[in-house]
């Protein structure tokens, strides 16, 4: 039995209240963005490991939510890529992915030297997110990800222990029509991805779109045929 359940187009996976429009002034470091809100300069936490060059740059539009952080009172939630808004907060990925799984899963399952996002029966499921789309191709990663490559190797090795591994991509960009690993940004991940898929790691690619303050399921896509 598949570990996944089907959702229809337009299924709402997450909704936020009272998001705040902002404009980026600068990216202070990997996790902090300086921005303007109603002519006031504020600092916001960016909980996204990606490089995000296409989204986080001076003058671009983002949406923030109020938080009770120790250092910052705002968190970046959505960023605009020139076409549409994308989700840029990794804290919500697991919750969104879980809405496409049958009941009975375990979160943060420890296997070998890693924690895999989900275990469901014999299925190991690792979740990654993607916002970069070029020529209708969803591309991951947007920066070198040693952690992502390591997870692929762990999934591949799990087959010999009787597991059925999946890598699941949540693509928060409705322009995506197919998926390809981003060889230009990370050739090691790309090569490992193709090797893993060829040798028994299954893949799943779910596309989402954002309207107002809510995220909806759009469609499932396949790998690009180059």
Curated annotation (Swiss-Prot):
InterPro entries assigned to the protein according to its UniProt record, in alphabetical order: SfsA, SfsA_C, SfsA_N
An annotated Gene Ontology molecular function: DNA binding
Domain of life: Archaea
Pfam family for this entry, one: SfsA
Cited CDD domains: SfsA-like (cd22357)
Gene3D superfamilies (alphabetical): 2.40.50.580, 3.40.1350.60
HAMAP family: SfsA
Family the entry assigns: Belongs to the SfsA family.
Protein name: Sugar fermentation stimulation protein homolog
């Amino acid at each position: 039995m598949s570990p996944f359940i089907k959702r229809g187009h337009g299924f709402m996976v997450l909704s936020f209240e009272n998001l705040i429009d902002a404009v980026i002034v600068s990216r202070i470091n990997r996790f902090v963005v300086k921005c303007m809100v109603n002519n006031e300069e504020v600092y916001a936490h960016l909980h996204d490991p990606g490089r995000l060059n296409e989204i986080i740059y001076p003058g671009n539009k983002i949406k923030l939510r109020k938080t009770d952080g120790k250092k910052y009172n705002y968190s970046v939630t959505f960023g605009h890529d020139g076409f549409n808004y994308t989700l840029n907060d990794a804290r919500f990925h697991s919750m969104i992915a879980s809405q496409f799984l049958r009941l009975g899963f375990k979160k943060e399952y420890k296997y070998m030297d890693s924690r895999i996002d989900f275990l469901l029966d014999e299925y190991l499921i690792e979740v990654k997110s993607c916002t970069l789309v070029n020529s209708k191709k969803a591309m991951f990663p947007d920066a070198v990800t040693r952690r992502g490559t390591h997870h692929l190797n762990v999934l591949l090795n799990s087959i010999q222990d009787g597991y059925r591994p999946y890598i699941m991509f949540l693509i928060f960009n409705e322009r995506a029509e197919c998926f390809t690993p981003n060889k230009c940004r990370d050739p090691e991940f790309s090569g490992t991805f193709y090797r893993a898929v060829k040798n028994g790691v299954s893949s799943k690619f779910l596309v989402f779109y954002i309207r107002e303050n809510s995220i909806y399921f759009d469609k499932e896509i396949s790998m690009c045929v180059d």
